[in-house]
Amino acid sequence: MSPPNQDAQEGRPDSPTAEVVDVRRGMFGVSGTGDTSGYGRLVRQVVLPGSSPRPYGGYFDDIVDRLAEALRHERVEFEDAVEKVVVYRDELTLHVRRDLLPRVAQRLRDEPELRFELCLGVSGVHYPHETGRELHAVYPLQSITHNRRLRLEVSAPDSDPHIPSLFAIYPTNDWHERETYDFFGIIFDGHPALTRIEMPDDWQGHPQRKDYPLGGIPVEYKGAQIPPPDERRGYN
């Protein structure tokens, strides 16, 4: 594969199309400590890469063109199904509308010129300050036939955390979707048995969300009461 076109690196975080979703202050996003190092004054933006321009470089253009053609046979326009195409760090990510995710995945798997027959699971991400798109599901795909890689990304709001399940297309996503539901609260519609897989069935909340409290128990040391971690300092 030839390297992606440098112009496509407009998808990088410092490009004009990049999206700032949060601003973190202090070292590791922690505030309220007795820091005297000066690192407590750090201010850092959390930035998501923006859309990349054509040509993307390498086999990326071929994937996008063939997927667009396959979707047209389904009477779906590529621009209606894919919100943006991002080339960042030599990787291709398609941000897909959640209601059209199964149709995009089906075409990626079944089209002879695409043949992304392997889905390596699904990962959840929580951006609490990205209003209306707080929850993200990320699917790494691999074409064993053509030795190509691709990533699909879908977003949903906290208020409506529903994303169509890909279990019928990639059955190996069974446990991965359960784990993402367990830890992030994303509801995969159509999954045959969407139950917790790591936490107890009666557990409250979803532990890998950014707004989930750290918890803990108070500790007594030499007569002093030390509160649980999430009450000692502020995390953003």
UniProtKB/Swiss-Prot annotation:
Topological category with respect to the lipid bilayer: Peripheral membrane protein
GO cellular component: cytosol; plasma membrane
GO molecular function: NADH dehydrogenase (ubiquinone) activity; NADH:ubiquinone reductase (non-electrogenic) activity; quinone binding
Keyword Membrane annotated: yes
Catalytic activity: a quinone + NADH + 5 H(+)(in) = a quinol + NAD(+) + 4 H(+)(out)
Cross-referenced SUPFAM superfamilies: Nqo5-like
EC number: 7.1.1.-
Top-tier EC class: translocase
Subcellular locations according to the entry: Cell membrane
Keyword list, A-Z: Cell membrane, Membrane, NAD, Quinone, Translocase, Transport
Coiled coil residues, start to end: none
Span list, region Disordered: 1-20
UniProt keyword annotation of Plastid present: no
Record note on quaternary structure: NDH-1 is composed of 14 different subunits. Subunits NuoB, C, D, E, F, and G constitute the peripheral sector of the complex.
Function: NDH-1 shuttles electrons from NADH, via FMN and iron-sulfur (Fe-S) centers, to quinones in the respiratory chain. The immediate electron acceptor for the enzyme in this species is believed to be a menaquinone. Couples the redox reaction to proton translocation (for every two electrons transferred, four hydrogen ions are translocated across the cytoplasmic membrane), and thus conserves the redox energy in a proton gradient.
UniProt record similarity statement: Belongs to the complex I 30 kDa subunit family.
NCBIfam families: NuoC_fam (TIGR01961), PRK07785.1 (NF005856)
Name assigned to this protein: NADH-quinone oxidoreductase subunit C
